[in-house]
């Protein structure tokens, strides 16, 4: 692991909301007196009925219950739109950048208010009210944000399904939450290609009971020719012409559900993660402000899709609650060229940029040229999200993208946590490439061993969280028992994250990957992230993924999939060189037993590597790869199978 330390630059400290001393003071207050701390910070949002109870939480076996600000009433849309109208009605709320670089628009807070009210009225006219579930299956267009906020305005519960999911996956999610209404688009656009969203919705509905979905609202994105079912389907623009742009907001209880978001479980059955209104918005807005050192007037861009939790918390709810200008991007980092991210930053003078390590690594493969031909002078803070960022990618991001003048906030959190839990703060935290560093306010990480014993000091183990924070998920939709079983049964009175971590002598946390991404080689535990970091540090390697496979002698062997930089050739000589490289870097125990050169890795459309598929291929067992509907490029898998290194079966 990297032991390089980057001190807080004077320029970061001088402009930051919080310095190191202030962080320590606030953190101490947040864990020693959470009621007082969150009682104060709960006032950062507006309440129609002020709360008097701050925290009412229990992680006790058989009695897991999480409530924050429970006697208060508020509305998320009021906080994200209406309260800003008097002071910043004409400020841009959303910059929308289309898949095609010639397509973009600015939406002010006043326009956002009108659009959200219009959408809410369209929903209300179709019987949607407080507590009803609405499924959104949309591309990254402004209507996705309008639909989220329209549901919130009415007290309805949105359940977004990422536009890359298959009709089967969509159907199971519509059924899971019992949505009577679906909002979609005729087609999506990604990297110049059309995505058949409406056709997928039609296929999904065919798999459901006839009387479940009553209405499908279709946003016209491409104007593509799609089938419309009379009496069920309506084009949004036609429905919107029939309603006004004024709609009262429903005050709801702090613990009223805001959204359900399905996330994959280790059993393969997706879990409906439930986030509620008050605590979630307090936490999303507070983390957005302090983690990104957000100042009034900053242009902020998170490259995620609203189909994932990062898009919920850090494209829509957190930024808009703070009156920010947030950028929504429909496209991909490599279309029409590898410079797209950096061109968008220059075009819109982006100050804060938040993306995933997988995007950074894929762009690294194309070299510095596409970055260096742009200015990027507006950038002030860089962020990373979605998986641990290996030190080499961190260094490239810092040096090449940020010209060594922007702090990187390497954020660790989960769908279940609602917001960022472990992260540097730009003006307060010395940085170590590859480390998520220190906990955010109110977050108490603990390290435990396999037996559940709490570990002190520098150590390696399983990462748990002691005590609740306002953004925490409340339950699994319709299955509270599964919630308790998944997160609270492994270690008593602790929230188990499912991730392994290392804590160093400075108290910094290094996330080593999912606990199921740990390989046991000859009785030694080896985090796959560590081996991957070592491989990616080699100058010829762009990306690597490491999994275990059954080994006659060691129990598990190490199987590495390696994607080389453009122009490099995968030879036997290079294979040996890479094995020696890892051996020297980490030690003989970490040497890959099998190494396969791969032109690409199987990824979901959100950029996550599908390790389950890699494990199956490494085990020479690819007859049942399971659900591959979320794969961005299915052809990648065929190549991996054809060139697999283990043919033992």
From Swiss-Prot:
The modification N6-acetyllysine is found at residue 608. InterPro entries: Ac_CoA_lig, ACAS_N, AMP-bd_C, AMP-bd_C_sf, AMP-binding_CS, AMP-dep_synth/lig_dom, ANL_N_sf. It catalyses: acetate + ATP + CoA = acetyl-CoA + AMP + diphosphate. GO terms for cellular component: cytosol. It comes from Methylorubrum extorquens (strain PA1). One of its GO terms (biological process) is acetyl-CoA biosynthetic process from acetate. It is an enzyme of class 6 (ligase). This is Acetyl-coenzyme A synthetase. Catalyzes the conversion of acetate into acetyl-CoA (AcCoA), an essential intermediate at the junction of anabolic and catabolic pathways. AcsA undergoes a two-step reaction. In the first half reaction, AcsA combines acetate with ATP to form acetyl-adenylate (AcAMP) intermediate. In the second half reaction, it can then transfer the acetyl group from AcAMP to the sulfhydryl group of CoA, forming the product AcCoA. Disulfide bonds: none annotated. CoA binds at residues 190-193, 310, 522, 583. Keywords: Acetylation, ATP-binding, Ligase, Magnesium, Metal-binding, Nucleotide-binding. Its EC number is 6.2.1.1. Acetylated. Deacetylation by the SIR2-homolog deacetylase activates the enzyme. Its cofactor is Mg(2+).
């Amino acid at each position: 692991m990297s032991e390089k330390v980057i001190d807080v630059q004077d320029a970061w400290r001088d402009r930051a909301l919080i310095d190191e001393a202030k962080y320590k003071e606030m953190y101490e207050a947040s864990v020693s007196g959470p009621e007082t701390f969150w009682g104060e910070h709960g006032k950062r949002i507006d309440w129609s009925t002020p709360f008097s109870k701050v925290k009412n939480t229990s992680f006790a076996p058989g009695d897991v219950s999480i409530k924050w600000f429970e006697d208060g009433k508020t509305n998320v849309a009021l906080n994200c739109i209406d309260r800003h109208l008097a002071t910043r009605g004409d400020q841009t709320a959303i910059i929308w950048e289309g898949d095609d670089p010639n397509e973009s628009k600015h939406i002010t807070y006043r326009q956002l208010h009108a659009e959200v009210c219009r959408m809410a009225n369209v929903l209300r006219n179709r019987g949607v009210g407080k507590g009803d579930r609405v499924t959104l299956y949309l591309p990254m267009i402004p209507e996705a944000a309008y639909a989220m906020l329209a549901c919130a305005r009415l007290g309805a519960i949105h359940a977004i399904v990422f536009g890359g999911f298959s009709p089967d996956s969509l159907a199971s999610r519509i059924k899971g939450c019992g949505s009577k209404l679906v909002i979609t688009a005729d087609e999506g656009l990604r990297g110049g290609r059309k995505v058949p969203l409406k056709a997928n919705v039609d296929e999904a509905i065919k798999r459901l009971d006839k009387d479940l979905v009553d209405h499908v609202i279709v946003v016209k994105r491409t104007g593509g020719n799609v089938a419309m079912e009379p009496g069920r389907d309506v084009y949004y623009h036609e429905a919107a012409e029939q309603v006004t742009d004024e709609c009262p907001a429903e005050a709801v209880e702090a613990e009223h559900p805001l959204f359900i978001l399905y996330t994959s479980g280790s059993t393969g059955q997706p879990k409906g993660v439930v986030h509620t209104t008050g605590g979630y918005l307090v936490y999303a807005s507070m983390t957005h402000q302090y983690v990104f050192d957000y100042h009034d007037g900053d242009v902020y861009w998170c490259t995620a899709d609203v189909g994932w939790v990062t898009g919920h918390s850090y494209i829509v709810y957190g930024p808009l609650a703070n009156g920010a200008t947030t950028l929504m991007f429909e496209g991909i980092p490599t279309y029409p060229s590898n410079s797209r991210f950096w061109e968008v930053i220059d075009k819109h003078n982006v100050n804060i940029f938040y993306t995933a390590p997988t995007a950074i690594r894929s762009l690294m493969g194309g070299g510095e040229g596409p970055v260096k031909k742009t200015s990027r002078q507006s950038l002030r803070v860089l962020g990373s999200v979605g998986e641990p960022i290996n030190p080499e990618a961190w260094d490239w991001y810092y040096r090449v993208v940020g010209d060594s003048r922007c702090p990187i906030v390497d954020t660790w959190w989960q769908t279940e946590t609602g917001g960022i839990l472990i992260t540097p703060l730009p003006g307060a935290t010395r940085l170590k490439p590859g480390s998520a560093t220190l906990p955010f306010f109110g977050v108490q990480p603990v390290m435990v061993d396999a037996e559940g014993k709490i570990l002190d000091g520098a150590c390696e183990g399983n990462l748990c969280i002691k005590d609740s924070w306002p953004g925490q998920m409340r339950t699994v939709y319709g299955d509270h028992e599964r919630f308790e079983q998944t997160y609270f049964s492994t270690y008593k009175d602790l929230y188990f994250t499912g991730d392994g971590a290392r804590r160093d002598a400075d108290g910094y946390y290094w996330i080593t990957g999912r606990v199921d991404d740990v390989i046991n080689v000859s009785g030694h535990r080896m985090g796959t992230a560590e081996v991957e970091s070592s491989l990616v540090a080699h100058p010829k390697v762009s990306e690597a993924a490491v999994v275990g496979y059954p080994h006659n002698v060691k129990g598990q062997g190490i199987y590495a999939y390696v994607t080389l930089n453009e122009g490099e050739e995968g030879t036997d000589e290079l294979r040996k060189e890479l094995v020696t490289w890892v051996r020297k870097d980490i030690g003989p125990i970490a040497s890959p037993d099998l190494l396969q050169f791969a032109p690409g890795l199987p990824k979901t459309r959100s950029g996550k590597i599908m390790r389950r598929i890699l494990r199956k291929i490494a085990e020479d067992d690819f007859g049942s790869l399971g659900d591959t509907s979320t794969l961005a490029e299915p052809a990648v898998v065929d190549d991996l199978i054809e060139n697999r290194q283990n043919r033992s079966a």
